[in-house]
């Protein structure tokens, strides 16, 4: 769509280049701008993919915040930053949406490099209130109390414990922070009612229960109106809880409470925000919204409200986008999915063993646990955005005789490492951790790449680590992990997997994917096993033969793999995780130890992986290629290593005989050995 077409379809939005432009609009124009923002976001996300439902629900909230507060002088923070698309639209980044979440384009989250209006690069939940506390304390200390700090919190963030730690300090320190609570009915109310200590104790007390039950029975005994009266009492009780409990909870923490108000009425929101802006301490404005507001398909999606939409450019035209909706979720990929393989596998083990329980942290759909929840609701636990609690709870279940399987995104494992290490690992609790979205994930950028799971997992002494090379391997690995009776980690990527590469692996054994002699061994870890095969084929065309092994289990390593690798002249490991401290480093150390034990000079070990830096968003294949982790890059690394080995072997010969010892096209000469260089 060209610039002129943008102006025709979005006449008001095309006039907004900064938040200052918003303050020139009247109430009617604000309503029309909200409608235009929704149409624009649906159109843009349909073209590129992205988070839809959360942004559609926060349109009026974001408009009102920018009309009342003066960003970037005032600080606007977005918890779970995928609800910041409207914020980006209103701060001069409309044209960037043509490349939303594309390599070199607009990030799907706040990004400090994009705009001074983005203070934090926030994409993990429950952190904004802590940022807000710190910024507000800094303004107070630096003599700038006139600068306001606003945190938009919602979309599940208040199920995370860190948010409550921040609330406690905000109230105690009387920090001047305005909390805008985006309550879309999918996260907030159940959490607060359970954490409102005084009323929870009251409702659970025997006297309260007996009195309430007697009143209900007495009303229901009244002829003609009894049943209706009893139902009315229950409804009234529920309504009163919703009205009273948030006020009691926040006020008890020393935080002023306003609301609830309509989160889709800009005028009402502006009035409330103006009052909140004048308050000298912490204040929460409770706004009721609807996730996916104004777009039929999102509102009709009861499970996720079109939370995350894949690109469907054929449907993204202005004539087909309306507030009632025209863009639907496109056809599912026919490629094999690791997540779907796990989903089936956990159902299978659950059917065979009633002790199996499945745990997730607010991700039942994306991790593939919805079928398990539907079949075994009594054995399914969603703890909300509380990964630390999930891990320690799983340890407790394992200690008491259950077989917990924790399905979690790889990137979120860093949020609960202490619990993995001390509560699961130290106790040897047989918890199986299934890390989805491992490796380079793509569009969501540095906060969502799963690059640390191997590093973290391998630092826990007794944790078994599995890396399936293809989806068909996931089921067998889950069975093997449950049979170990020790902690275990299975990590697998978001991207579709290859067709079967070889005969299925068994137990803790490796798989030989290609026989190419004993001199060169390529170890492709997880999804990079296929890449190693492709690299070997490229090398074979040049007369360089290499064997390819899929380790399958990184720890404990198969003794057969160690024996084969220790006897080679060159070993190359490739992984789509962090290079330093990852699987390659662990394997290299094990090869070194095995070589020393056998009193042989070990092979040259070349490790390939992701360097220690924050990897931006982009297509996974493109990112991996730039890191040298595609077949071409891996083959190039093999050639370079062979040249090094040839040089190291030739130098002594040249000194002794004045002649060089070369390498033929087929590989290294027998007897040539390289130094162990890792």
Show which residues each predicted segment covers:
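Thiamine diphosphate
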Residues: 99-131, 141-146, 172-304, 330, ...
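Glycine-rich, histidine-containing beta strand-loop boundary motifs that form or position
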Residues: 56, 78-80, 153-154, 181-183, ...
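N-terminal amphipathic, basic-rich helices that act as targeting or association modules
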Residues: 2-91, 249-271, 279, 283-289
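Helix-enriched interaction subdomains in cytosolic or periplasmic regions
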Residues: 307-319, 453, 458-501
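Cofactor-binding active-site loop characterized by glycine-rich and histidine/acidic residues
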Residues: 51-173, 355-356, 369-370
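Amphipathic, well-packed alpha-helical segments that form the structural scaffold of globular domains
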Residues: 34-42, 133, 347, 370-373
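Short alpha-helical segments and helix-capping/turn motifs at coil-helix boundaries
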Residues: 44-47, 58-67, 131-137, 161-173, ...
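Extended, hydrophobic alpha-helical segments in both membrane/secreted and soluble proteins
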Residues: 149, 153-166, 368, 380, ...
């Amino acid at each position: 769509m060209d610039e002129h077409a943008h102006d025709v379809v979005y006449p008001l939005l095309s006039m907004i280049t900064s938040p200052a432009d918003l303050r020139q609009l009247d109430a009617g124009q604000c309503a029309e701008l909200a409608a235009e923002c929704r149409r624009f976001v649906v159109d843009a996300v349909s073209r590129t993919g992205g988070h839809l439902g959360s942004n559609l629900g926060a349109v009026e909230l974001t408009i009102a915040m920018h009309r009342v507060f003066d960003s970037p002088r005032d600080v606007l923070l977005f918890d779970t930053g995928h609800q910041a698309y409207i914020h980006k639209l209103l701060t001069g980044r409309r044209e960037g949406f043509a490349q939303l979440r594309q390599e070199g384009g607009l990030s799907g989250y706040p990004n400090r490099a994009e705009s001074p209006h983005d203070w934090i690069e926030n994409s993990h939940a429950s952190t904004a209130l802590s940022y807000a506390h710190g910024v507000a304390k800094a303004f107070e200390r630096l003599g700038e109390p006139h600068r306001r700090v606003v945190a938009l919190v919602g979309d599940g963030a208040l199920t995370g414990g860190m948010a409550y730690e921040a609330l406690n300090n905000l109230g105690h320190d009387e920090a001047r922070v305005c909390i805008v609570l985006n309550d879309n009915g999918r996260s907030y109310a159940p959490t607060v009612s359970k954490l409102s200590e005084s009323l929870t104790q009251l409702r659970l007390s025997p006297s309260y229960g007996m009195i309430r039950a007697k009143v209900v029975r007495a009303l229901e005994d009244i002829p003609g109106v009894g049943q209706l009266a009893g139902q009315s009492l229950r409804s009234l009780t529920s309504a009163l809880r919703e009205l009273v409990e948030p006020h009691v909870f926040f006020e008890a923490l020393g935080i002023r409470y306003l609301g609830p108000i309509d989160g889709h009425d800009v005028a009402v929101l502006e009035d409330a925000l103006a009052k909140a802006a004048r308050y000298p301490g912490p204040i929460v404005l409770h706004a009721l919204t609807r996730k996916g507001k104004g777009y039929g398909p999102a509102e009709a999606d009861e499970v996720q409200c079109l939370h995350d939409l894949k690109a469907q450019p054929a449907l993204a035209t202005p004539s087909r986008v309306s507030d009632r909706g025209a863009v639907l979720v496109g056809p599912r990929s026919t490629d094999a999915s690791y997540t779907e393989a796990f989903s089936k596998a956990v159902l299978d083990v659950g059917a065979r063993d009633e002790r199996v329980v499945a745990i997730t942290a607010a991700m039942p759909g994306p991790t593939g646990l919805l079928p398990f929840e539907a079949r075994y609701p009594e054995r399914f636990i969603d703890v909300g955005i509380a990964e630390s609690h999930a891990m320690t709870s799983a340890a407790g279940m394992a200690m008491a005789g259950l077989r917990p399987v924790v399905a979690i995104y790889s990137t979120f494992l860093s949020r609960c490492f202490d619990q993995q290490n001390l509560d699961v690992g130290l106790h040897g609790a047989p918890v199986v951790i299934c890390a989805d979205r491992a490796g380079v994930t793509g569009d969501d950028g540095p906060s969502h790449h799963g690059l640390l799971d191997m590093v973290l997992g391998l630092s826990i002494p007794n944790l078994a680590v599995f890396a399936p090379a293809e989806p068909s391997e996931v089921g067998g690995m889950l069975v093997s992990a449950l049979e170990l009776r020790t902690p275990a980690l299975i990590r697998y990527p978001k991207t579709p997997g290859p067709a079967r590469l070889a005969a299925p692996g068994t137990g803790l054994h490796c798989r030989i994917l290609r026989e190419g002699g004993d001199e060169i061994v390529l170890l492709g870890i997880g999804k990079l096993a296929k890449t190693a095969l492709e690299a070997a084929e490229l090398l074979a065309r040049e007369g360089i033969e290499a064997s390819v092994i899929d380790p399958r289990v990184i720890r404990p390593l198969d003794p057969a793999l160690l024996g084969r690798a220790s006897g080679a002249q060159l070993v190359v490991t490739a992984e789509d995780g962090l290079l330093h401290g990852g699987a390659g480093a662990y394997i290299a150390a094990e090869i070194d130890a095995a070589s020393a034990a056998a009193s042989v000079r070990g092979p040259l070990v070349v490790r390939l992986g992701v360097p220690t830096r924050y990897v931006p968003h982009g297509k996974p294949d493109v990112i991996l290629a730039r890191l040298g982790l595609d077949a071409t890059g891996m083959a190039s690394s093999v050639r370079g290593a062979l040249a090094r080995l040839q040089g190291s072997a030739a130098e002594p010969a040249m000194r002794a005989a004045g002649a060089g010892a070369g390498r033929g096209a087929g590989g290294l000469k027998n007897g040539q050995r390289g130094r162990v260089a890792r």
